[in-house]
Structure formats: C-alpha cells, structure tokens
A protein has these predicted regions:
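Short hydrophobic core segments
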Residues: 15-17, 124, 148-159, 191-192, ...
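FAD-site-proximal beta/loop scaffold in flavoenzymes
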Residues: 170-187, 270-350
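Beta1/beta-strand and adjacent pyrophosphate-binding region of the FAD-binding site
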Residues: 7-20, 185-195
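Flexible, glycine-rich terminal cap/loop adjacent to redox cofactors
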Residues: 17-22, 26-43, 48, 55, ...
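Glycine-rich flavin
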Residues: 2-12, 28-35, 40-185, 218-222, ...
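Glycine-rich dinucleotide-binding loop and its adjacent helix/turn
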Residues: 54, 153-214, 292-294, 298-313
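Catalytic nucleophile loop
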Residues: 23, 195-198, 333
Length: 475
C-alpha cells in the first residue's frame, strides 16, 4: 500500500483512465460540479470514435457515395466526357480526414482545459487500495517517467479494440484501426467478418472503387439485426457488386511475391487481395491496467463487471462504455459518463440526476444502403411471447426512377397487438439513420400505431412510409 504524501504525486476526487467519449464526458461533468479531476490518455484524445471509428467511417462513407451519385447523375441529364470521369485521390481523402481528426483531437483537449481537468499523457495502471480509502493509479509517460496518484473515485473508460486474426498468416491481415490510413488504396479487398463493421467497410471500399469480397462463417451477415433487414441489405450489397460468401471462413493467409495476399478459404477457394481486413469482433481494452491489483473482476469475455451504478467489485472503482460490454455505442458511453458524474458529484443545479435507460436505443449501420433501427426486431418480439402485428413496405425510391439504380428501400414496424404500441422500427435505404433518429423519440414516448396513422406525412419522402403503412404483413 502506497501512502499519500510519500510516493504519491497528487490526489484527486476522480481519476479517469481513457480519453474517449465516455471518459471525457464524465471528467468534464465532474469538474463542472467542482470535483478535482485528472484524466490519463496514452494516445490521441477522442478514443475509437474520433480517431478510427465513427467519424472517419462516416467521412469515408460520404466519399463512397459520390461515385454512385456521379453515375446516377446521368439519369438526370448531367453529361461530361467519359475521359474526364471523376477519379478517387486516395492521398487527398486521407489528408482531409487526418486534418478533421486533428481538429477534433484539439476540441477534446480544449474541453478538458476549459473544465480544469488535469490531462496526464501516458499509460495508466491501477496500484490498488491506498490509505484513507483511496485508490492508486500510476501513469507511465512515453519517455518512461512514472507518476503515482490517488483518488476517491477511479473511472475506467478504456473502450475496446479490434480482435486480431488467429489463423496461420494472420499477421498479414489488418483491422479497422489501420483501414483508413493504408499507404495505397486496396484495389482488391477481402473482408473477413459479417458484423456491422465488416459490412460497412465492404460497402464503403466498394463505393470507393475496390473489388470487394466479404467472407462470413455464419448463414447471414449482420447477426443481431432484424432477419428481414439482414437479408435485404445483403441482397442490396450483392446487387451493387460486393461478393458475399457465407458459411465460409479463412484457412490461412500467405504473402505473394508482389505484396499481395493469397487467402485460402475453407471452401477450397484461393482469393488474391491487396489487403485482408479482419472484422470479426472487438474485445475490451484492459491490457496493462493491472486490474488484479485492485480486485476488479472481469467476465468470461474480459469485460469489466459492473452493477447498475457502474461500480466494480472494488470500492471506488467504476467502469463505463465498451470496456463493460453493455452496448458498444458512443452515445451510450456519453450517457453513462453523464449519469456517473451525477451519481458521484450530484446533478447540475435545478436538474434531476440522470439515470441510464437502455430501452429503445437507436443504432445505425452505414452500409450502402444504410440501416436505421430502434426497438425490438421481429424475432425478439416473437420470442417475448406477446401477439404482434408486422407492417412492412419495400419499394423503389423516387430518386431511382430516373437514376437507373436498382437500389430499393425497406421500412418495417413491429406493433404490440394488445397495447397497439410500436415496439420496433427498422429501415434500410437512403438516409435511414437520419430518419430513424426522429422516430426513436416517438418509440421512447410510447407511441402507438394509431398515433403513427394519425400523423400526416411529408410528401414525397421515404420517411412518410412509416405513417402510411396500413396493411398487416404478418401477425
């Protein structure tokens, strides 16, 4: 046990480990309540979302959409010489992305400075209980210098990291962390994994001009989403030109003489690719935290175990975000950070303490077409054992009547038959995430199908389909 005032360099009310969305939000809110707060981060501020996740992914998704838009413009009368067709400047895209990420890194750093949070650059590890009921944290800077600190409360918000390939030659594969900054654009890309990250990357890089093959060991991609939506989006991806191989996996990866990768699949195929992206899931980032020193328990998947108040089994130590494995979404980590700050240091004057509510959390998948979803899937609703009604519509968006694109849209409502409440809303099509965000408010307020029906739609839009669905597809 280290004694404060001897080997410890400083003490705080709250010590946050991790400068991602959840950690920064908790630190800022706590500091605004008058707490003495420190935050340790060994890399760039902003965490996965800002640096190698949500933000660069969405920027590249925008970029991918332009190639399709250029082609569709011909259907609306736009003409240009074929020789002058737009070409992707990969270096320019990377540079623009890097500039925006650097700006956001600065924004996060500025938020900490303005709030009076002490930012410590380096890797943090737990030291265990200290005198006076405090917890100890050691920070090792890049130059090897170490400092020790104590805090009444310690928050672990270190997020997650991509799972690496474990097949022979797996070291030749890359993860989503490296995907946005490849030295050269991969003209041939093999994506391993059919989750949302794999499907997003396959769609994005296909849109940017790559020849993409997606390999997934399951029967259908996007496990966990509504089955009908999964089938629909997989079909749309294949129609666009992404090759999707299900019930198939990688046996080994070899290096070719020209720098290419030779990938042997379990079905006997050999695929040559310029890059092999492994997107087979993410795992909690707890390496080097020295959790055992503070008796912080983890589950079988390595996620830190917490109760409904984000408390670990170790007194004074809390965890939020991807490292606890509840819902790996940036807005969830932000909400958890605010709820914890209220819990530990009280809410803002005149405001009630925030409470976490994990019901009806909307989410999106930025495939082409994108997905927006909130509430129960049809499968979840049926498994609950209550009678339901399913409303759906699949159609060709107005834009594509002239564009010549074969892209279609799907909208779907799940309704509890007894209460008439809309318990699930799903969409795949243009602007699906933007549309779903608004309807998520309605579901959170307990909107009924009758209330949807009584709402006049905006015409002509895709969103109006949700308030004009009348025919029950299944019950």
């Amino acid at each position: 046990m280290t004694r404060p005032g001897s080997l410890l360099d400083s003490s705080f009310d709250l010590f946050v480990i991790g400068g991602g969305s959840g950690g920064v939000r908790a630190a800022r809110m706590a500091a605004q309540r008058g707490a003495r707060v420190a935050l340790a981060e060994g890399s760039r501020m902003g965490g996965t979302c800002v640096n190698v996740g949500c933000i660069p992914k969405k920027l590249y998704s925008y970029a991918a959409g332009y190639a399709e838009a250029f082609e569709e413009a011909r259907g609306f009368g736009w003409r240009w010489p074929q020789a002058a067709a737009p070409q992707l400047d990969w270096a320019a895209l990377k540079s623009a992305r890097a500039q925006e990420i650097a700006r956001l890194n600065g924004v996060y750093e500025g938020l900490m400075t303005q709030a009076g949070v002490a930012v410590l650059r380096g890797q943090a590890r737990l030291l265990g209980p200290q005198a006076g009921g405090l917890q100890g944290v050691q920070v090792r800077a890049a130059d090897g210098r170490q400092t020790a600190h104590a805090a009444r409360h310690v928050l672990i918000a270190t997020g997650g990291m991509p799972r690496r390939a474990s097949v022979p030659g797996g070291e030749l594969a890359i993860t989503s962390d490296e995907m946005f900054d490849l030295p050269a654009f991969p003209r041939r890309l093999l994506v391993v994994g059919g989750g949302y990250i794999g499907c997003e990357m396959a769609s994005i890089f296909h849109g940017l001009g790559a020849d993409v093959t997606l390999v997934y060991r399951g029967e259908q991609v996007l496990r966990g989403f509504d089955d009908e939506v999964r089938t629909f989006v997989a079909g749309q991806m294949q129609q666009a030109g992404v090759r999707v191989l299900t019930r198939c996996d990688v046996r080994r990866i070899s290096a070719g003489a020209d720098g290419a990768r030779q990938v042997a699949l379990t079905d006997g195929q050999i695929i040559t690719a310029d890059a092999v992206l492994y997107a087979t899931g993410r795992e909690p980032n707890t390496r080097g935290l020295n959790l055992a020193a503070a008796s912080v328990a983890v589950d079988a998947g390595g996620h830190i175990e917490v109760d409904e108040h984000f408390a670990t089994r170790a007194p004074g130590i809390y965890a939020i975000g991807d490292v606890v494995g509840r819902m790996a979404l940036t807005p969830v980590a932000l909400a958890e950070g605010m709820a914890l700050a209220d819990q530990l240091f009280g809410p803002a004057p005149g405001q009630p303490a925030r409470q976490m509510n994990y019901r009806n959390i909307p989410t999106a998948v930025f495939t082409h077409p994108p997905i927006g979803t909130v509430g129960l899937t049809e499968e979840q609703a049926r498994a609950a054992g209550r009678p339901i009604r399913v409303y759906r519509s699949e159609f060709r968006p107005l834009r594509h009547t002239l564009s010549g694109s074969g892209e279609r849209a799907l909208v779907k409502l799940i309704v509890d038959d007894a209460s008439d409440r809309v318990t699930g809303l799903h969409m795949a099509g243009p602007d699906a995430p933007e549309i779903t965000q608004g309807f998520a408010v309605a579901l959170q307020c307990g909107a009924t199908k009758a209330q949807f029906d009584a709402t006049i739609g905006i015409h002509p839009t895709l969103a109006e389909e949700f308030v004009t669905l009348r025919q029950v597809a299944r019950n």
